[in-house]
């Protein structure tokens, strides 16, 4: 495949046929002739932005021993390389074919997701190129196939503080909508009896991906209310934020009446009380803020 895919023109009855172009790309790429490692590289890269990702970062996220297969795909013209900026990417049309052919699911892309998840969890550390990481997270959210909703919900929840930290406030509302969407999917699925699958990444020390059940916990519901309340601050809707914080606190207090508090639930309840106090301060209700 040539580097400049925009020069390919396919016509049927003198009219441009988008479907024909995709069909020709499928034949040219011949994914069935690639080895499994190369297919996995395409599967993961298809989730990342077409603007490009650093080649060294991609190697680290996939825990590749070498870039041999990546370089071969570059030589074939399937992957585009910007040698000046040291980035790699897929052309948008090739990305579309790669997604359709390799089916990038949460489970199959767990190694890369674990590394990005760990970056989101490192709240106290500044990472290199945070904008690149955020663009990767946005692209993944657009293209990932959700075969493991329980893990991906946790991943989305942990993305919020990362975007908030680097002040990408424009994306926060979309991220909250995505969180709620996944929660609704899990609710619609009912209580699943699917067999658990666990993927460990001993080399990276990143979290396990475990498929349990489509169960929405009190923590999930309270955290969604917390994030929704935070979105109200720029609009100065402090009273609505206070209502959401109170509802979230009630959820967690009821949860603790029948369940032993763990680190997650205890920390969340503490943060909710702090955030409620902050909302009262913005509302200039100093007595309630104490």
Residue ranges of model-derived segments:
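Structural motif corresponding to the intra-repeat A-B loop/turn of tetratricopeptide repeats
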Residues: 166-169, 235, 283
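Loop-to-helix "switch" segment enriched in basic
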Residues: 1-38
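C-terminal boundary/linker of central alpha/beta nucleotide-binding cores
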Residues: 25-102, 109-114
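Intrinsically disordered, low-complexity terminal tails and inter-domain linkers enriched
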Residues: 185-216
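Hydrophobic/aromatic packing residues within the alpha-helices of TPR/SEL1-like helical repeat arrays
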Residues: 176-179, 245, 252
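Conserved alpha-helical positions within TPR/SEL1-like repeat arrays
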Residues: 219-234, 264-282
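Extended alpha-helical scaffolding segments used for macromolecular assembly and cargo binding
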Residues: 108-188, 212-219, 223-224
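Single-residue signature of alpha-solenoid repeat helices
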Residues: 172-175, 241, 289
């Amino acid at each position: 495949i040539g580097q400049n895919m925009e020069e390919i023109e396919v016509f049927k009855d003198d009219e441009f046929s988008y479907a024909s172009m995709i069909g020709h790309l499928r034949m040219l790429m011949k994914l069935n002739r690639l080895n499994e490692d190369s297919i996995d590289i395409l599967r993961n890269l298809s989730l990342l932005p077409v603007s490009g990702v650093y080649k060294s970062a991609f190697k680290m996220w996939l825990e590749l021993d070498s870039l041999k297969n990546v370089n071969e795909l570059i030589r074939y013209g399937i992957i585009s390389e910007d040698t000046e900026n040291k980035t790699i990417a897929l052309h948008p049309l090739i990305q579309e074919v790669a997604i359709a052919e390799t089916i990038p699911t949460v489970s199959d892309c767990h190694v890369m997701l674990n590394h990005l998840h760990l970056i989101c969890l490192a709240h106290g550390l500044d990472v290199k190129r945070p904008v690149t990481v955020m663009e990767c997270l946005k692209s993944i959210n657009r293209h990932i196939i959700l075969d493991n909703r329980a893990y991906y919900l946790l991943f989305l929840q942990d993305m919020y503080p990362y975007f908030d930290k680097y002040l990408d406030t424009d994306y926060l509302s979309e991220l909250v909508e995505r969180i709620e969407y996944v929660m609704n999917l899990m609710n619609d699925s009912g209580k699943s009896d699917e067999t658990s699958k666990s993927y460990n990444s001993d080399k990276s020390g990143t979290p396990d991906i475990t498929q349990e059940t489509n169960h929405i916990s009190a923590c999930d519901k309270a955290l969604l209310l917390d994030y929704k309340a935070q979105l109200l601050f720029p609009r100065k809707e402090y009273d609505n934020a206070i209502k959401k914080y109170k509802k979230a606190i009630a959820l967690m207090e009821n949860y603790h009446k029948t369940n032993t508090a763990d680190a997650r639930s205890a920390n969340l309840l503490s943060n909710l009380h702090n955030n409620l106090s902050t909302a009262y301060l913005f509302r200039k209700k100093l007595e309630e803020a104490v």
